[in-house]
């Protein structure tokens, strides 16, 4: 296999046995692909597909005026260029978006002509607001913050059949129902009631008999019965009836008389129940008619009206129950033939017939009126209104749309073969649904499972944005229709008709405040990726937490390979927010698909198919771990498979598909947990969730025991710098990498230079630090896709969320009681868990009524010492170390004239002092924060003079841009001249630049020539002359282009900023805060083993082994057995082996052993103990040495999920590292030097520091802000609040009779206003007495009682 630039430097020993059939797909594809389809950027108008924005426009346009004499048509749209790039948007706090310009055509028809002749056509581009762009990492920058739009899992449109699980009626009878759910429009429900009649509801309103809907559709009673029932035909013969016999219909009935065949042989005796055997005999005998007595038909229902043969008078309407009287009338009228409905109690119930009987309507109009009354109660119905309402409900494309998905699901469910069709319902659709419902009630067919992933689909960003856009367009449509009538007469242009505000507002609202548009979780690269791959059942059109039951939240068999069964939040959202499985993707309809290998006749092929939950149901799917021989044939006699959503075993020849990988079941976060298969599911859930909260440490440290997914996550998350094209590193420093691109990858006419600017010390959404460090050095060769710089939490292109710590599992003086963690001081000294947090503090100068606020260093009543970190503009220097209360930005606000004291008047008179009319409102460092200023940004409103600091910042930025562009030009020029040199050397010159005709050009000559002079050479070969001219033109073009670019950037920098109304200036100060680990911080492993640091012990007191190596962390062994996360123990053992092997390699390097020995030892590690084979022969000696140097700290291992290291392999690794195979060793007490009495498990575990830091939670208050009504202190750290002393705490003090404590808690410490001020004064004066008064909350109580109309007064003595 080929190794990438970083893989070569550090190979991870992989224990997986199964081959990689398929790489893990790009992890952010679900976001990027969806939005790309929505915008269709870079596609020409002619090639626009009917999706996304284009589809939204086509669904609303053309807009036709009310009179029909004018129309506005949509032609196409184009997207402009963004005003700022992503970084500038974040800095300025604006949205990263492009202007949308739509070309529309206004057509005015001639009113006079009969055939609508066109009178006038105007075409124009209209601005329709801004559309946010997605960044290349799948996020949106909205008002300067990065946001993610989470995909939504909602019920697919279509038709669903269900029952009430016997909960509605006390008898426990199952009441079946059907529901047609469109993509947009009214819901249509059919349901049975306990008496077995069928009812219909529209939009969950009052129910009507279902026959009302059928009548409204234009069906007569007879047509309805004809559609739903077969008929029995009876012929009248004298005193008896003859039935046209269909033998199957007799099954289960009791014979009323003997049934004989033609020869007179009795087939069924009278009184016997007719069985399947009897029916076969009747079929064989070929009996076509059966004599039955007259009373056989009493109680049956007529299928068609019975008419008097002579007079045409109706004797019995259709759907009438036959009685003896009716039979007598029929006999009298000589009716010879009539038909009844065929019903029975087993599989053909009389439900529709019964419904027709309770239906009061008789014709279509009555039915329409009935529906109108139900939809619009209290409005007088008219024929037209009723018809319009009914047609608009389900048959108008504007109001109702099943969508392509809905139509496909609908047709599949009712058994049609075609999957395409109209977006609106038809009469046949409604009848087909009713038929299916009746069939299910009759026992044919089954109800749907709504939690099946074939019935739930994913709505991604693009689709939600399109819906929102359509909502905006529909709002515009109304306004346009009204203005179109004016356009006919007044000659308006399209621009005057369309107001883009509603569209822009709808889009802005969606991206800014929709429930699914979330502030990106940016703790570390994994949390970013997971957030973008999240699938939520909540949100508009989805479920609500309160209504979601247990079934929706549960793991469903169809989740396999589509949605992770492990990763979901704990708490109220459990099961409603899920994560996409590693290999899952959505299909064109939005259903989740999982990949499988095709198996033919027991042989596994390399063909891969993606199947949705519906498509895979009939397949027999083997697991990825099924044993295969060399030919790829399944060898076991019985293979463990999934079939019809059940786990079972089948013979190899029955198998049709096979999983592609064992990790296709779990999500990205879960696939990063080594030995996941040994952890309990609940702990694995905590483990995957806590990895997302890990704070990037100062120096990232790759996990010694990983799973092999680390590289994919780091690469796809976008925090690393990945080479866009291969080439040679031309120059590299801490802030940028310049690559000279390989000739074969350079497109014609472009520079062939890629400049990568690195992100340095930037703030993330969670205030962690984003910083990139280059991995390459000058002259290195990189290929496309290689990782050139590490980001936060990545180490050589691998995800590195924490640190490898030497842990021992043993109790230690009670310091690790209840999951506490005992740390060694060495961890703090080595800055292993030191993290950098960046805080942004903002100071805003506004225009007030009394005059503008000013930012300056001239602040009243502030000493010199407080100002020594500010420059003359009043803004803190970059690099200043500041602490709580320090001034960062000096700001003064004018205050109203107050009454002056005589002293002030005197001062005023003497000095003309005006210091008193402003107050100090400077930006100060908040309490508990200490750090270094790393950056300052100043934004000034247009027309306000910029201060010296703003100008200095601008100059610095311009210098950087100029340096970048010069560098680019230098490389372009260099590359061009290199190509010229190779062409010119050895060629014959004609003259120019002081050369004689016929001289051959040499390298030395060119070196001595100024570059500008090269172009004066005249060559004998015309092609060379042409090349020289082209080169000269190319270089001057580039120069011009780069100058233009610089001017453009300069213009952007110098133009004023677009600030909120009333804001003159904004200063943003960025503080870098360094946090060491300390007691109270939360730490965790990757197996859900979390704890709080309880104590940091001196190194010399920690337990150590026989060599004197102390452990870093002591964990409590009692945390393992009851929690069943044994993965952490296996990780510890394998980690010990990894570290031991690293130490062994280090000793070999120190002893300067031969490279051959190193090579042999590395081959032993990588190729002799299980797992993947590594090709070390392709490494040169230098590369082997570099590899060995990188392995000194430990040989990283990969134990993939469900395909990891076996116990025997861990032991073999320990043996190879010369360590005890038990993984346990004798430890000594650091304080006494005594040996502990039994061996202890010691090894290396990967520990994370979570973003729950004690510094952020620590909080204390003496006095502060109070609530307005109750006068009690506010709550919470953000409000600088107090601790609530609630009713249960009051009971506790009452129980102990602590009267004085209780009194001060309820009065002076809380809401006795006078008492607390007096108390504060007393304490200041050193007098510790209190005088409690009346608590304010008592007054509130009195007011509340008075508001009930009860007069209450407190009588004071």
Curated annotation (Swiss-Prot):
One BP term from GO: DNA-templated transcription
Entry superkingdom: Bacteria
GO cellular component, one term: DNA-directed RNA polymerase complex
Single Gene Ontology MF annotation: DNA binding
Class of the enzyme per the UniProt entry, highest EC level: transferase
Pfam families, sorted: RNA_pol_Rpb2_1, RNA_pol_Rpb2_2, RNA_pol_Rpb2_3, RNA_pol_Rpb2_45, RNA_pol_Rpb2_6, RNA_pol_Rpb2_7
Record key words, sorted: DNA-directed RNA polymerase, Nucleotidyltransferase, Transcription, Transferase
Catalysed reaction, written as an equation: RNA(n) + a ribonucleoside 5'-triphosphate = RNA(n+1) + diphosphate
UniProt EC number: 2.7.7.6
Family: Belongs to the RNA polymerase beta chain family.
Quaternary data: The RNAP catalytic core consists of 2 alpha, 1 beta, 1 beta' and 1 omega subunit. When a sigma factor is associated with the core the holoenzyme is formed, which can initiate transcription.
Function: DNA-dependent RNA polymerase catalyzes the transcription of DNA into RNA using the four ribonucleoside triphosphates as substrates.
Protein name: DNA-directed RNA polymerase subunit beta
Name of the gene this protein is made from: rpoB
């Amino acid at each position: 296999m080929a190794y990438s630039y970083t893989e070569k430097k550090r190979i991870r020993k992989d224990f997986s046995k199964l081959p990689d059939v398929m790489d893990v797909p790009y992890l952010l594809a679900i976001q990027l692909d969806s939005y790309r389809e929505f915008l269709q950027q870079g596609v020409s108008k002619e090639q626009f597909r009917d999706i996304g924005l284009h589809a939204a426009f086509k669904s609303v346009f053309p807009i036709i005026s009310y009179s029909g004499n004018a129309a506005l048509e949509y032609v196409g749209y184009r997207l402009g260029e963004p005003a700022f790039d992503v970084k500038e948007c974040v800095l300025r706090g604006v949205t990263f978006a492009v202007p949308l310009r739509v070309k529309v055509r206004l057509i005015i028809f001639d009113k006079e002509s009969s055939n609508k002749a066109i009178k006038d056509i105007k075409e124009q581009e209209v601005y329709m607001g801004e559309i946010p762009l997605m960044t290349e990492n799948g996020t949106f920058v909205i008002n300067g913050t990065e946001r993610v739009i989470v995909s939504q899992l909602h019920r697919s449109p279509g038709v669903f059949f269900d029952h009430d699980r016997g909960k509605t009626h006390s008898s426990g009878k199952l009441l079946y129902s059907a529901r047609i759910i469109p993509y947009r429009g009214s819901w249509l429900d059919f349901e049975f009631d306990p008496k077995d009649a069928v009812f219909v509801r529209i939009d969950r309103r009052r129910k009507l008999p279902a026959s009302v809907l059928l009548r409204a559709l234009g069906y007569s009673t007879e047509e309805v019965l004809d559609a739903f029932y077969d008929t029995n035909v009876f012929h009248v013969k004298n005193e008896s009836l003859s039935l046209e016999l269909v033998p199957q219909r007799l099954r289960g009935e009791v014979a009323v008389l003997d049934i004989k065949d033609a020869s007179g042989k009795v087939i069924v005796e009278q009184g016997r129940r007719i069985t399947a055997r009897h029916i076969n005999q009747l079929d064989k005998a070929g009996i076509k008619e059966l004599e039955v007595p007259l009373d056989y038909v009493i109680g049956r229902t007529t299928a068609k009206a019975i008419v008097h043969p002579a007079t045409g008078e109706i004797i019995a309407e259709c759907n009438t129950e036959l009685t003896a009287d009716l039979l007598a009338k029929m006999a009298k009228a000589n009716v010879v033939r009539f038909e009844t409905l065929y019903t029975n109690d087993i599989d053909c119930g009389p439900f529709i017939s019964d419904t027709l009987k309770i239906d009061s309507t008789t014709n279509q109009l009555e039915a329409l009126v009935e529906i109108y009354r139900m939809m619009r109660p209290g409005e007088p119905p008219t024929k037209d209104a009723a018809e319009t309402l009914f047609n608009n409900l389900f048959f108008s494309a504007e109001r109702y749309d099943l969508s392509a998905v809905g139509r496909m699901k609908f047709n599949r469910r009712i058994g049609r073969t075609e999957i395409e069709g109209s977006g609106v319902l038809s009469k046949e659709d409604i009848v087909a649904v009713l038929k299916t419902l009746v069939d299910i009630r009759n026992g044919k067919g089954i109800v749907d499972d709504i939690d099946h992933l074939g019935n739930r689909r994913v709505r991604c960003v693009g689709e939600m944005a399109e819906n929102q856009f359509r909502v905006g367009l529909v709002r515009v449509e109304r306004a346009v229709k009204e203005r179109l009538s004016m356009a006919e007469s007044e000659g308006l242009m399209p621009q005057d008709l369309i107001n883009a505000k509603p569209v822009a507002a709808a889009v802005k609202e969606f991206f800014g405040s929709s429930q699914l548009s979330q502030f990106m979780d940016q703790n570390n690269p994994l949390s970013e990726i997971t957030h973008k791959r999240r699938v939520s059942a909540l949100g508009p059109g989805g479920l609500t937490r309160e209504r979601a039951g247990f079934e929706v939240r549960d793991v469903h068999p169809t989740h396999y390979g589509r949605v992770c069964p492990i990763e979901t939040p704990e708490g109220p959202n459990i099961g409603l927010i899920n994560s996409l499985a590693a290999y899952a993707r959505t299909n064109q309809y939005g259903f989740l698909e999982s990949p499988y290998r095709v198996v033919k006749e027991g042989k596994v092929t390399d063909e891969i198919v993606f199947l949705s939950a519906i498509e895979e149901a009939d397949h027999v799917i083997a697991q990825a771990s099924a044993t295969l021989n060399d030919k790829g044939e399944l060898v076991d006699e019985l293979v463990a498979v999934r079939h019809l959503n059940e786990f079972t075993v089948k013979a190899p020849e029955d198998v049709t598909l096979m999983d592609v990988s064992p990790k296709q079941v779990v999500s990205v976060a879960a696939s990063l947990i080594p030995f996941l298969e040994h952890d309990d599911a609940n702990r694995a859930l905590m483990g995957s969730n806590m990895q997302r909260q890990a704070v990037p440490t100062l120096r990232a440290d790759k996990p010694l025991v990983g799973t092999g997914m680390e590289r994919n996550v780091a690469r796809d998350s976008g925090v690393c710098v990945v080479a866009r094209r291969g080439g040679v590193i031309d120059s590299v420093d801490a802030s940028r990498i310049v690559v000279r691109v390989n000739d074969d990858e350079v497109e014609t006419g472009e520079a062939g230079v890629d400049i990568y600017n690195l992100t340095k010390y930037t703030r993330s959404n969670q205030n962690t630090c984003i910083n990139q460090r280059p991995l390459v050095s000058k002259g290195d060769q990189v290929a496309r896709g290689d990782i050139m710089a590490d980001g936060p939490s990545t180490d050589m292109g691998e995800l590195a969320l924490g640190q490898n710590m030497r842990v021992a599992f043993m109790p230690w003086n009670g310091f690790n009681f209840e999951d506490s963690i005992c740390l060694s001081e060495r961890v703090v000294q080595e800055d292993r868990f030191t993290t950098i947090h960046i805080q942004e503090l903002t100071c805003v100068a506004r225009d007030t009524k009394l005059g503008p606020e000013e930012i300056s260093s001239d602040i009243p009543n502030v000493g010199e010492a407080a100002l020594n970190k500010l420059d003359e503009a009043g803004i803190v220097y970059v690099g200043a170390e500041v602490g709580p209360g320090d001034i960062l930005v000096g700001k003064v606000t004018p205050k109203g004239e107050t009454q002056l004291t005589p002293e002030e008047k005197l001062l005023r008179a003497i000095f003309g002092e005006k210091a008193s009319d402003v107050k100090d409102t400077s930006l100060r460092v908040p309490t508990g924060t200490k750090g270094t200023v790393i950056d300052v940004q100043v934004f000034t409103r247009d027309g306000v003079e910029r201060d010296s600091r703003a100008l200095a910042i601008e100059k610095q930025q311009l210098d950087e841009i100029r340096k970048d562009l010069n560098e680019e030009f230098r490389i372009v020029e260099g590359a061009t001249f290199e190509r010229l040199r190779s062409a010119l050397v050895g060629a014959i010159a004609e003259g120019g630049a002081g050369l004689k005709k016929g001289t051959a050009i040499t390298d030395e000559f060119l070196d001595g020539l100024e570059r500008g002079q090269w172009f004066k050479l005249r060559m004998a070969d015309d092609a060379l002359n042409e090349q020289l001219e082209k080169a000269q033109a190319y270089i001057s073009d580039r120069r011009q282009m780069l100058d233009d670019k610089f001017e453009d950037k300069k213009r952007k920098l110098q133009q004023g900023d677009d600030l909120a109304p009333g804001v003159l200036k904004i200063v943003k100060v960025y503080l870098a805060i360094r946090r060491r680990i300390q007691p109270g911080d939360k730490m965790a492993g990757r197996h859900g083993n979390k704890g709080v640091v309880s104590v940091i012990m001196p190194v010399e007191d920690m337990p150590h082994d026989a060599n004197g190596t102390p452990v870093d962390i002591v964990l409590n062994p009692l945390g393992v057995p009851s929690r069943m996360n044994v993965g952490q123990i296996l990780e510890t053992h394998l980690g010990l082996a990894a570290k031991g092997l690293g130490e062994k390699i280090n000793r070999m390097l120190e002893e300067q052993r031969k490279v051959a020995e190193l090579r042999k030892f590395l081959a032993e590690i990588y190729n002799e103990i299980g797992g993947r084979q590594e090709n070390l022969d392709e490494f040169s000696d230098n590369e082997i040495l570099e590899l060995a140097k990188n392995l000194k700290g430990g040989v990283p291992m990969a134990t993939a999920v469900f395909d990891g290291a076996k116990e025997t392999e861990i032991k073999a690794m320990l043996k190879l590292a010369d360590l005890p195979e038990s993984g346990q060793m004798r430890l000594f007490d650091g304080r006494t030097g005594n040996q502990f009495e039994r061996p202890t498990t010691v090894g290396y575990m990967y520990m994370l520091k979570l973003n729950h830091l004690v510094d952020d939670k620590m909080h204390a208050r003496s006095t502060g802000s109070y609530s307005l009504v109750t006068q009690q202190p506010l709550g919470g750290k953000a409000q600088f609040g107090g601790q609530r002393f609630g009713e249960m705490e009051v009971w506790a003090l009452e129980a102990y009779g602590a009267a004085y404590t209780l009194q001060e808690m309820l009065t002076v410490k809380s809401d006795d206003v006078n008492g607390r001020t007096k108390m504060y004064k007393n304490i200041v004066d050193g007098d510790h007495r209190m005088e409690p008064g009346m608590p304010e909350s008592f007054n509130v109580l009195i007011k509340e009682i008075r508001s009930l109309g009860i007069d209450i007064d407190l009588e004071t003595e």
